[in-house]
A protein has these predicted regions:
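One face of beta-strands
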Residues: 64-70, 98-100, 117-119, 189-191, ...
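Flexible, processing/modification-adjacent segments and terminal tails
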Residues: 20-26, 37-50, 57, 78, ...
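N-terminal leader/targeting segments and the immediate start of mature chains
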Residues: 13-80, 88-94
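Gly/Pro-enriched, hydrophobic low-complexity segments
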Residues: 146-148, 153, 171-258
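Buried hydrophobic packing residues in well-ordered domains
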Residues: 66, 99-100, 126, 170, ...
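A generic structural motif
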Residues: 69-75, 101-103, 121-124, 179-181, ...
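Extended lipid/amphipathic-ligand handling interfaces
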Residues: 55, 85-90, 111-112, 219-225
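Sec-dependent N-terminal signal peptides
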Residues: 4-12
């Protein structure tokens, strides 16, 4: 039977699918004694492809239900808003389905390893609209998070390079640079993610606009332990160009056992 799962945008201490293993540089050199700054471009690509595949395959160990709020702080002078949001996630065969429902509509993100992400936006009494990746490069419910951010779209881009390993927040991280096949106006030119090598969760990401300027910064802010596993409780996206910022705060609880 289908099992309800709560995948938060960045999974912490997650299980993996059998098909994915941690990148070679982590398995072969866990203390980063050999691989620190990675100069060899072929190694950058190999480690990057392995890392993106592993992160696509991550799943939480147990089901979690979630409600929460978007706390939206617009550029200076604007009125702050709080938007209630409901989260629902379930597995449909090899596909992971994430739904984010606000009053104005529901975003459904369908993701399977190695396949294009499918985005669907449904408003009340309207036929659901299928969005391509470029169309998903738009704000979700007026927040600084784009729909494509919620789908971790950058992990599916063809160009993935691990360029170095360094400490961040006291944890050894791989620095993953993700670039799309082509840069489109209004989209991203690259995303630089600091990935904790233990949990394989993102501890910081910098997202650059089509002109190569820093646009947004993503950071997880708080975690909660449920059934012995850490889950993301709060995360923030701030716009470096406008000064706006959005926090997503999750109210988490274990899902009822099927």
């Amino acid at each position: 039977s289908m099992r309800a799962l709560m995948i938060l945008i960045v999974a912490a201490l997650a299980d993996r699918l059998d098909a994915a293993v941690k990148p070679d540089h982590i398995l072969q050199d866990p203390q980063a004694r050999v691989f620190q700054t990675i100069v060899d471009v072929e190694l950058q690509k190999r480690f990057g492809a392995q890392m993106a595949l592993y992160m696509q395959a991550m799943r939480p160990a147990n089901a979690v239900n979630g409600n929460g709020v978007l706390r939206i702080r617009p550029p200076r002078g604007g009125k702050r808003r709080t938007v209630p949001v409901e989260f629902r996630t379930f597995a449909l065969g090899p596909t992971l389905v994430n739904q984010y429902a606000v009053e104005e509509g529901t975003l459904t993100v369908r993701a399977a390893v190695g396949k294009d992400t499918q985005y669907e936006w449904a408003t009340p009494n309207q036929k659901p609209e299928q969005l391509d990746v470029e169309q998903a490069m738009q704000s979700f419910a007026g927040a600084d998070f784009w729909m494509a951010d919620l789908g971790l779209e950058m992990l599916r881009w063809p160009n993935q390079n691990v360029i170095e390993r360094r400490l961040r927040r006291g944890e050894l991280c791989s620095v993953l640079v993700s670039r799309p096949a082509k840069v489109t106006e209004g989209g991203y030119s690259k995303v630089v993610s600091w990935v904790d090598e233990d949990s394989m969760g993102i501890v910081r990401a910098e997202l650059f606009d089509a002109q190569g300027k820093l646009l947004k910064i993503f950071e997880p802010k708080a975690f909660k332990k449920i059934d012995g596993q850490w889950h993301l409780k709060e995360m923030e996206m701030r716009n470096d160009q406008t000064g706006s910022r959005t926090a997503i705060v999750f109210e988490l609880k274990p899902a009822p056992k099927p």
